[in-house]
From Swiss-Prot:
It is found in: Cytoplasm. This is Inositol monophosphatase 1. Belongs to the inositol monophosphatase superfamily. Mg(2+) 2 binds at residues 93, 96, 224. Gene3D superfamilies: 3.40.190.80, Fructose-1,6-Bisphosphatase, subunit A, domain 1 (3.30.540.10). Keywords: Cytoplasm, Hydrolase, Lithium, Magnesium, Metal-binding. SUPFAM superfamilies: Carbohydrate phosphatase. Substrate binds at residues 73, 95-98, 198-200, 217, 224.
Amino acid sequence: MEDRWQECMDFLAVSIARKAGSVVCAALKEDVSIMVKTSLAPADLVTATDQKVEEMIISSIKEKYPSHSFIGEESVAAGAGSTLTDNPTWIIDPIDGTTNFVHRFPFVAVSIGFAVHKQVEFGVVYSCVEDKMYTGRKGKGSFCNGQKLQVSGQKDITKSMIITELGSNRNPEFIKTVSLSNMERLLCIPIHGIRAVGTAAVNMCLVATGGADAYYEMGLHCWDMAAASVIVTEAGGTILDATGGLFDLMSCRIISASSREIAERIAKELQIIPLERDDGKSTNS
């Protein structure tokens, strides 16, 4: 039986991600014009390249699939909605790791997820400076540059290495009582270590490769998580909400791990913060 979405991933999403990545890499050699999305988050940056790449991705897909829906980071920032419907929907982060991009820190990715009936069917994450193309298709496995991926399978959190990020919130009280205290609780279990790469999509792909045993973060958006979520699960990993419940793409928080045991153990340690959902429904508690 023909798998139309597999073909869509292989011959459209991958080629568009690679083309977008070449634009990003070229822009890294030029002066970057930096903007701040909101005065409430002075570390939440955006550049003209983010906007250019997203427009290119959406226009390329619309040529072939004019009836499809789109949720893009820069489109939402400009006032577009981010409600996920049953319609085939492309969920796009043109540059995941914009702060890395601004500083030329070499971990930036183009992230393209595709959902039908609110379920992610496939994801493509192109870590363009590294030239690593991560793909995951529901029920078909996940790969990096054609090599099949498998999580570490680690179940003992005391033998784990975990990735997280401090995010863009620079409120001193928040940093002290939430961000750093969550890290402290995990380090004191103890665990082997905590790392930060600066891009949610690549962080999750590192879990899929087995290079890290887990990644957690709160304050994300659906475009940060969509593509990589299926890459992790197809590599044998577990995706949960930060509370330990079922993962919800619109919840703005995630734990992705090599095993359910580690994911649930992390959830027990985390102080949960209230977050506005991407779909505008009631605030997460």
